[in-house]
Amino acid sequence: MKWWKTIFLSSFIILFCLLLTVSLFSFTLSEITTKENLKVFAGAVLKEELRSAKDLDLEKGYTLLLEQCQFQDTIEIPLEIQTVAIPCSDIKSSTQTTFVNLVINTFVDAIYDKNFDCSFISCLQKLNGTNLAFMLLSNTGHQFYTEVFLAFIALLLIVGILIIFMSEPKIAGIKNIGISIIIVGLGYFAFLYAKALLLSNVEVLSITPALFEILLNNFLILFIAGIVITMIGYYVLHYYEKRIKEE
C-alpha cells in the first residue's frame, strides 16, 4: 500500500472511531430521554423526594388532599426542585397507593412537554440551573440527541465507504471497520471499571446504576458486533486471497 493511502486510511479509521463514539453517546441519551424511560428514572428520584417533602406527607395526607379538593380544583405539591400542580379530578380517581405515581407522571409530563421557546443550542446559552437540567431531559433534548445520532450515522456510512475505498484490497475494508468498532466497544470495560469505582467511593443517586447499565449494554453490543464483523471480514478476505492464488 502506498504511504499516502496508509495515512488516509489511518485518518479515516480514527475519524470513524470518534464518530462512532459520539453516535453511541447520543443514542444512549436519546434512549434515556424517552418519556417512558424518564418516568422510570425520575420515579426513583421523586419517590425519595416525596418521602422527605417538608410541607406534605403524601401517604398519610392523602385524605387531607381529598378534603382540600372539595374547595379547589387543583392541588400544588411543593417539591424541592419543582412545584407540581395536579387536578383534583385526577386525585379523586386515584388511590393512596397510586397517588405517588400520579405525582411522578404529572411531573414528568409537565417537564417533558414544556415549550422552552428556544432551540437546544440557544437554550444551552440562555438557561441555567434547574431549567437547564429540565431542558436537557425534555422532549427538546430528546429530539436533539436523536437528530445528532442520525446525522452521525450518515457520516459513519460515508467514512466507512472511504475506509473500504482506501483499503488494499478493498475487501479488507470490512475487517478494518470491524476492528474500529471493537476499539470503540472496548469502552465497555473502561466504563465497567468506572461504575465499580464510582459506586464504591461516591454517594450517588439511586438511578445511577441503571443509567450506567444502559450505557454499558450499548458498549457491549457494539463490542460484540465489532467482533462478528471482524470475523466476517477476515473470512471474506481469506476467501478472496485464496481465489486470487487459484487464478
Regions found by a protein language model. Name each.
Residues 2-11, 145-202, 232-247:
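Juxtamembrane interface at the cytosolic side of transmembrane helices
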Residues 8-25:
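Hydrophobic membrane-insertion alpha-helices, especially the h-region
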Residues 25-34, 236-244:
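Juxtamembrane/interface segments at transmembrane-helix termini
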Residues 27-36, 192-204:
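Membrane-helix interface motif
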Residues 35-139:
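Long, solvent-exposed extracytoplasmic domains/loops
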Residues 135-157, 216-225:
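N-terminal membrane-entry
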Residues 202-214:
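Short, membrane-exposed interhelical loops at transmembrane-helix boundaries
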Residues 220-238:
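Alpha-helical transmembrane segments of multi-pass membrane transporters/translocases
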